[in-house]
Each structure stands twice: as C-alpha cells, then as structure tokens.
Amino acid sequence: MYTLGEIAKTINAKLVGDANIEITGIATSLSANQTQLTYINGNKYKQMLINSKAGVVILNNNLLKNCPTNALVVDNVYLAFAKATHLFKKQTVHCQGTHSSAKINYAKIAPNCIIGKNVVIGNHCTIAPNVVIEDDVIIGNYTLIQPNVSILQGCSIGNNVVISPGVVIGSEGFGNAQDQQKHWYSIAHLGYVIIGSNVSIGANTTIDRGTIEDTQIHNGVQIDNLVHIAHNVIIGQDSAIAATVTIGGSCTIGKRCMIGGGATIASHISLVDDIIVTGASTVDKNLSEQGHYTGFTSINKHQKWKKIQVWLLNLDKIAHYLNIKLKELKGK
C-alpha cells in the first residue's frame, strides 16, 4: 500500500489531488475501484477516463480536464505505468522444503520440492522431485505434477490436471516500456495464471501470468509440448493445442478450437468457438466464423510482403477478370 505522494515521487509525476490517499493495487480502467490505480494512454480512451471509478489515473496533460478523480500527470504514460507496477509486485523468498503455513491434504510429495507460504494442495495429488510451488498457489484434487515443474506465485490449478516435466506456469510476461533514450523498462506482471480442471499441459510448455488481469486456461484444455502462451491469453473449454504453437499476448481462443503444431497466433487476436487452424499457419487477424483456416507465405521485406498479400487476397478477382478478357480475345 502506497500513498499518492509516494507513487508520484517514484514515477516522477505531477500529482493533482490528495497526496495522502492510499492505493492498494493496480487494475484496468474498467475495473479499478477507489483504492486502485489505473492508466489512460491516448485520447481514444477518453470515455473510459470519464467513466473511471479509479482512485488515481496516470495520464498526460491533455486529458487532465476530463479526469474525474486524482491524477498523476506525466509525458510518457506507459513508462510511468511500468514503474508503478513494481511498487505492487509481491516478492517470493524461496524456503527450503515445505513452509509451515502450507495446507497439504493427502498427497505424495517427492524429495527436493519447494512449497511456499500459504500453498494449498488438494487430496490425492502427486508432486514429483524438484518441483517449485511458490507462495499462495492453490492446487486442486487428483493433480499430477511431474519433475522440474515451476508454479509461480499466486497461480491456481484445478482438479485432475496433468502437468508434464519442465513446465513453467506464471512466469513474467514480455512487457516493456521505452524511455526517451530508447532504453527498456520492464513491466511487473501482477496477474496470475488460472487453470481449470481436466487440463493436460505438455513438457516444457510456458504459460505467462497476466499483466494486470489473469491468464486463463479453461476446463478440459489439452496442451502439447513446447507451447508458449503469452500474458493475458484466454483459452476456451476443451480446446486442443499441438506442439510448438505460439499464442501472442492478449489473445482469446474460443471453446473446442484445434490449433495445429507450429502455428503462430499474433497478439490481440480473437478466435470464436470451433475453429481449426492448420499446423504452421500464421493467424494475423480475428477469426469470427467457425471453420478450418490455413495460411502461410514465405518471408519478404515487409513492404514487398504487403504488396504480395494484396495480390493474393485478390487472386480470385484477378483470375475472373483475366478469364473474361481471354474469352473476349478468343471471340475476335
């Protein structure tokens, strides 16, 4: 918990409001309450600012007149937000063995495991050697955690989940802000990973925690080996993801989707329910209709690639036009 005055000093902001108000955490502009901080970066989000219930908003000067609450005024909003996240990041200190506050029901726990503060492990779980379970993790019943798995602070695992060797759940997402000198400043990720029941996660898969809200893997999802799931992703119930798939940040995958091996889904993409993506495809736009999708082209200079894409997208029209012209020529 920090006062607005302390936060303003940390992020080098001009404070407009009460310096003694205490802030307990960070939330999105839509969900923040009177004890939380949020940020608004750009005029297109002005209406969100006007409707905000946050205790304080990080913003730039041209939005100050629209702010209904306390404000932290800066030039680089995203950089200031990045600095603020580190104030609210919980730090985990690894103990040896099992912390005395952990609540472990009937479970088999192998040697060399680390189990942190306030961990809850359900009935009939099996924890293999060299597993790290950090503070505040909750694990349901009948879950199998195989060797060398790391489940990091605050994450939640449902019932009857299988987690294969080398999996990392709750690692920091890839989020950074740049300063004026183009130096990078990391964003501390404050969300968690929430995994439902009857989920299978293949070896060496990584699932990043959310930036502010949680990364979510719903019930029945099947994930193969070496899959990367970035921060803020939501994967719907009973979807299946084959090996080496990469899912970019803030994607939403619907229910019962099937993603073929080696496919890449770009950040901020949404797939509706019952989508099939062919292996090695690149998904760079929202898929709003059920169906089977395929797409991959060779790499080129970006400007050339964009021209090629325009031609490819219009090949049917071009072919139709050429057929008409060919018939006209034959008729002469």
From Swiss-Prot:
**EC numbers on record:** 2.3.1.191
| Catalytic residues as annotated in Swiss-Prot or TrEMBL | H231 (proton acceptor)
Q: Which reaction does it catalyse?
A: a UDP-3-O-[(3R)-3-hydroxyacyl]-alpha-D-glucosamine + a (3R)-hydroxyacyl-[ACP] = a UDP-2-N,3-O-bis[(3R)-3-hydroxyacyl]-alpha-D-glucosamine + holo-[ACP] + H(+)
* Gene3D superfamilies reported for this sequence: Hexapeptide repeat proteins, MurE/MurF, N-terminal domain
Q: Which GO terms describe its cellular component?
A: membrane
Provide this UniProt record's keywords sorted from A to Z: Acyltransferase, Lipid A biosynthesis, Lipid biosynthesis, Lipid metabolism, Repeat, Transferase
Q: Name one GO molecular function term.
A: N-acyltransferase activity
What pathway is this protein a component of? Bacterial outer membrane biogenesis; LPS lipid A biosynthesis
List, alphabetically, the InterPro entries matched. Answer: Hexapep, LpxD, Trimer_LpxA-like_sf, UDP_GlcNAc_AcTrfase_non-rep
User: Which GO biological process categories is it annotated with?
Assistant: lipid A biosynthetic process
Q: Which Pfam families match?
A: Hexapep (PF00132), LpxD (PF04613)
State its role.
Catalyzes the N-acylation of UDP-3-O-acylglucosamine using 3-hydroxyacyl-ACP as the acyl donor. Is involved in the biosynthesis of lipid A, a phosphorylated glycolipid that anchors the lipopolysaccharide to the outer membrane of the cell.
Q: How does it assemble?
A: Homotrimer.
Per its UniProt record, what HAMAP family does this chain match?
LpxD (MF_00523)
Identify its protein family: Belongs to the transferase hexapeptide repeat family. LpxD subfamily.
Protein name, UniProt field: UDP-3-O-acylglucosamine N-acyltransferase
The gene name reads lpxD
